[in-house]
Regions:
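Helix-breaking motifs and short loop linkers at transmembrane-helix boundaries and internal kinks
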Residues: 38, 70, 90-96, 234, ...
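Extracytoplasmic gate region of multi-pass secondary transporters
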Residues: 26-27, 203-245, 249-256
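Cytoplasmic helix-loop-helix junction between adjacent transmembrane helices
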Residues: 99-142
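A late C-terminal transmembrane helix in Major Facilitator Superfamily
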Residues: 323-362, 369
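Conserved MFS/SLC helix-loop-helix module at the cytosolic interface between two early adjacent transmembrane helices
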Residues: 57-94
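C-terminal transmembrane helical hairpin of 12-TM major facilitator-type secondary transporters
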Residues: 270-317
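Helix-loop-helix hairpin linking two adjacent transmembrane segments in secondary transporters
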Residues: 127, 135-183
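Helix-to-loop junctions at the C-terminal end of transmembrane segments
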Residues: 58-70, 255-269
Length: 388
């Protein structure tokens, strides 16, 4: 039983890492695309926006497909599509085709959250589900780090498309491995999700609202860390990149630790998972108020490490909590809805933070994120105190 658990979690985590290597290659390669096609900063922004729109547009449809056809099919096809998408970016002869490829790439990444969550909750014993979610959620930051090394590292040795092509090869290899290896992992066919039930589930809707706040916090923090360290602390861009790496590393640690606590603490699953999630988000809210007090790179590194552990580390338990308040047959669609909310938060959070920073200062921006964290805590507490 223990061997099967680690085999399954390792397989799902490997899938998540490979998918993230393909998806985040675009973020790592923005400067390469700029130089290759002579893009302006606005045009580079369009690439990222198109990628994100593709992701957001297909989250719910792919969540439905996962509930209907099973995660083995959707995750295998999804990773194959990601590999093709990142390869098309490398092969695109014009900027317009880069945008088409970016949209395709983003759309296939939409299967990641509903598919991997369903794989965990359908096949892992309830006593170990939350730490399994925490472990597989290490995939995005690890995949992002790997793609950064591939895309920016190989350009000086080979050609600018090399990193994208290697990412595509990784995606193809892992997609094949996953399709073969997951066959005996206990996948099952599911019926169409109960949308009426989800819309009538007060706890789920409150968590979706909380996810919007947490998503805004996550995307804004990761997007502005390097810039803040450079402009406010006065450190070099490379130092800001190091602080960002620390933030991501502690984010991974926070997800694993929170998942473990969600499994081993006493009490009902709803109570212990919701409580740990509340503590993480509240801790993040307090820490955001301390960011302006950091005056050296070391102090910034410490504060952002703690932010990773608390604010960004809450991602895993957020999906765990969603799985508790919905039925098993609806986990794929419910997870997709939660991720859609987080992505929506990522669309409005950074511009709002930027506006506050320009008009008032960074302190106002960090207080804004702290307020969103506290709002998320309030919504989670309402779910804890209420019932479906």
């Amino acid at each position: 039983m223990r061997t099967r658990y680690w085999r399954l979690v390792s397989l799902i985590t490997t899938w998540h890492v490979a998918a993230s290597v393909c998806y985040y290659a675009v973020f790592a390669g923005t400067t390469l695309l700029r130089d290759a096609f002579g893009l302006s900063p606005v045009s580079v922004g369009f690439v990222v926006t198109t990628l994100t729109l593709g992701y957001a547009a297909f989250l719910l449809p792919l969540g439905v497909a996962t509930d209907r056809f099973g995660e083995r099919r959707t995750l295998s096809v999804g990773l194959l599509g990601l590999a093709v998408g990142v390869a098309l970016i490398a092969a695109a002869p014009t900027f317009e085709l880069v945008l088409v490829a970016a949209f395709l790439l983003g759309s296939f990444y939409g299967v990641a959250t509903p598919g991997t969550n369903k794989a965990i909750f359908d096949n892992v014993d309830p006593s170990r589900q939350h730490r399994a979610i925490g472990l597989k959620q290490v995939g995005p930051p690890l995949g992002s780090a790997i793609s950064s090394v591939l895309v920016t590292g190989l350009v000086g040795v080979l050609f600018w498309q090399a990193g994208f092509l290697v990412a595509a090869a990784v995606g193809l290899a892992v997609a094949s491995l996953f399709y073969v290896a997951y066959a005996g992992a206990g996948a099952s066919e599911a019926a169409y999700p109960d949308f009426r039930g989800l819309l009538g589930n007060r706890s789920y809707l409150l968590l979706v609202a909380a996810g919007t706040c947490l998503g805004a916090v996550f995307y804004t923090t990761t997007g502005y860390t390097v810039l803040y360290v450079e402009e406010s602390i006065g450190a070099a861009v490379a130092v800001g990149g190091l602080v960002l790496a620390v933030l991501q590393a502690f984010s991974s640690a926070g997800r694993v630790l929170a998942g473990w606590l969600g499994d081993v603490l006493p009490g009902e699953p709803r109570t212990r998972v919701g409580s740990v999630l509340s503590v993480q988000a509240l801790g993040g809210g307090v820490l955001f108020l301390l960011v302006p007090a950091a005056s050296t790179p070391l102090e910034a590194g410490v504060v952002f490490a703690l932010l990773g552990l608390f604010a960004l580390g809450s991602v895993g338990l957020y999906y765990s909590f969603i799985s508790i308040v919905v039925s098993e047959d609806d986990i794929g669609s419910a997870s997709a809805g939660g991720q859609f909310a987080a992505t929506f938060g990522g669309l409005f959070g950074p511009p709002a933070f930027g506006y506050l920073t320009e008009s008032i200062g960074y302190g106002a921006g960090w207080r804004f994120l702290g307020g969103l964290s506290v709002l998320a805590v309030g919504l989670v507490i309402v779910v804890l105190l209420g019932s479906r």
